[in-house]
């Protein structure tokens, strides 16, 4: 357990350090990539324990391989809350905005700013007198959601699906 915790902490510290000196575009793409990885782990903890099935579902080009699909699946399977779903969808839209923009893209652009201001999780935690920038709201949301997804993955492991027993005819009459 200590190894898992220290590994997660090192992973987290590495991400925070990387965010400090990156452009807005890099932060948006790195943050969503990080969340996508954790959503994949969450789903993998929940589905049956079969590496082939996991790869078939969660592989990059497969049904649950995209950030959008993983967000929807995690919510549809009841693995994340409505608020987490809301913020993940907004983060997905923010990321798409940065990917589509051939220029660098910035968090202070009006449409990105609006999406960041709609994130719900920071408003539950940040003090009212604080006025964080859209970039900070985004980074803060990614940080909180990453921790939540790690915690949810450990919960999902206790609810791991198992294949059903052998086929059995049922008399419906």
Where on the chain are the PLM-derived regions?
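Amphipathic alpha-helical interface elements
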Residues: 1-173
């Amino acid at each position: 357990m200590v190894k898992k915790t220290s590994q997660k902490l090192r992973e987290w510290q590495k991400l925070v350090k990387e965010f400090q000196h990156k452009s807005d575009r890099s932060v948006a793409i790195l943050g969503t990539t990080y969340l996508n990885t954790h959503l994949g782990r969450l789903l993998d903890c929940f589905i049956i324990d079969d590496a082939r099935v996991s790869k078939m579902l969660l592989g990059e080009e497969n049904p649950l391989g995209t950030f959008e699909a993983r967000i929807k699946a995690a919510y549809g399977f009841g693995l994340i809350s409505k608020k987490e779903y809301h913020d993940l969808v907004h983060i997905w839209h923010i990321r798409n905005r940065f990917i589509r923009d051939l220029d660098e893209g910035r968090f202070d652009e009006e449409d990105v700013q609006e999406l960041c201001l709609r994130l719900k999780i920071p408003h539950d935690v940040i003090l009212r007198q604080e006025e964080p920038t859209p970039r900070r709201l985004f980074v803060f949301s990614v940080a909180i959601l990453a921790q939540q997804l790690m915690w949810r993955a450990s919960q999902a492991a206790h609810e791991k699906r198992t294949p059903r027993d052998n086929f059995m005819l049922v008399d419906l009459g």
